[in-house]
Structure formats: C-alpha cells, structure tokens
Amino acid sequence: MSGKEESSNYAATAEEEAVNQGFVLPEGEIMPNTVFVGGIDITMDEIEIRDFFTRFGNVKEVKIITDRTGVSKGYGFISFSDEVDVQKIVKSQISFHGKKLKLGPAIRKICTYVQPRPVVLSHPTPFHHAWNNQNADSYIQHSPIVSPITQYVQACPYPSSPPMAIQQIPVGCQQPGYFQVSPQWPADQRSYMFPTPAFTFNYHCCDMDPNGGEPIPREYPIDQTVSASGANPQKRYVEMSTQTIVSCLFDPANKFHSFVSQEDYLKDNRVHHLRRRESVIKRVSK
C-alpha cells in the first residue's frame, strides 16, 4: 500500500471518529504525529501537558494557543517526534486535573487564494478650458498627453465584492499641457502706464535788506511732477492759511536771524518798492 493510500485511509478514519464524538473536522490537510487537545484549563501550562503525554511517545513540542493579551484560548497542539498512533490517542478517554480533554487529529487549514481580478482604470475626460475677454488675453488649456500605463492588479481580492471601476488620474505623463496666448484687443483700447518723473525747479526771489540796501537774491527749490500724459508741469498750490513760507533775513545790527511770515514779507516788499518808485520819480523830476 502506497503512502497516499495510507494517508487517505487515515484521514477517513479520523473523520469518522470526529463525527462520532459530535464535532465536524474543518477542511484541510491532516498533520501526521500531531494531536489536537481541547478543553485545556487556564491553570495548565505546557510543562505539565508535556509530562502527561509522554506516556504516548516522545513529545516534540507543545503549543497552547493564546490571544493577544497572552490568555489561553483553551486548546492547543501536541507534536510527537516519533511515529505514534494518533487514532489510538484520540479514542482514549483522557482526563487531566479532573477535566476531560477533547482530542482530535490536527488539521492544517488550506489557504484558499482567489484569482485576482484586474482593476479597470479609465482615463480622465479631456479638459478644455477657454476664457475670452475683449480687454484681456485668451488662454486655452489642452489636455496633457498621457503615456500608456500598465494596469495594476488588485493585491488584496475580496470574494464578496462586485467588480468595480476605479477612476483615477494616471501617474505616468510624458509632458505637461500647452498654453497658447493670443492677445485680442483693439489698438485704440491700449493704455500704457509710466512712472511719474519728479523734477526740481529753482525759484528765484529777492530778500530785502532791512537797512535799505540792495536786495539779496535767494534760491528756493520747488519739486514739481509731470503728468503721465506728457502735458505741462502740474503746479502745486499752497494755501497761505495752512502753510506759510518762512523767510530768514539776516539782521547785521542785532546779529541774529529774524523770522517773518509770508504776509508780512509781501507787505514790506510792496512798501519798499513804492518808496523806491517815489524816490526815483523825485530824482527824475529834479
């Protein structure tokens, strides 16, 4: 009898024994020389179980299944290094610490793989955007040229999920989109803005000597701006009530500077000119 026939007969016998004990074996491959032990108390440890099952053969490994917190789930597996009769161990009624153990063949579950289904990738709809304005430029945005992209296969298949089409933006792009700029405006609607230049003009005036001497020429710089249209300089008017031009006259008698307002200065200037005119008329009449 070949090894395959022996394993098949052993699996059939183990399944019959499991059905007789009232539980159904899961689908999978029966592990040789390994026994499933259920009904393990929390107080039991692996050393005690190893010492107890040495009567059936040389115990290779004892594995108690625990949860994430390390608490025993109440079952485990015992592997023997020698050839043992697993059916004999399963049929025997074993009680440990006054508690009956549930024995059965150890079965390795078969990992079922679902054939991966390719995910359908749809290319995005070409996007055209045109914005026109009479007084502005026209921008036309074309869709970017996309290179062929390899279809991605879903790594984690879900058997119960229906086929789905995922629309996403492709990653592999050869070159970005192009923009065409075409200026559209009439010639008479163009307007140009230039910075306003600043010019400084020197304003010449004469300060009168209080002793009746010759007038003293002086220069006062005045800033003027030129309009953007290129016309004449814009005059800057100063209200006499809000701002007065102070003229500093040197007094040789008292050796200090006296300050007079614009109104007093103009009044004294008119009186001085009238006096000079009268003196000139008198000299001519003589």
UniProtKB/Swiss-Prot annotation:
Belongs to the RRM DAZ family. Signal peptide: none annotated. One of its GO terms (cellular component) is pole plasm. One of its GO terms (biological process) is oogenesis. InterPro entries: DAZ_dom (IPR043628), DAZ_RRM_vert (IPR037551), Nucleotide-bd_a/b_plait_sf (IPR012677), RBD_domain_sf (IPR035979), RRM_dom (IPR000504). This is Deleted in azoospermia-like-A. RNA-binding protein that is required for primordial germ cell (PGC) differentiation and indirectly necessary for the migration of PGCs through the endoderm. May promote meiotic cell division during spermatogenesis. Shows a preference for G- and U-rich RNAs and probably binds the 3'-UTR of target mRNAs. Stimulates the initiation of translation of mRNAs through the recruitment of poly(A)-binding proteins (PABPs). Its main location: cytoplasm. GO terms for molecular function: mRNA 3'-UTR binding; RNA binding; translation activator activity. Interacts with the C-terminus of pabp1 and with epabp. Prior to oocyte maturation, found in a complex with epabp and pum2 proteins and spdy1 mRNA; pum2 dissociates from the complex during maturation.
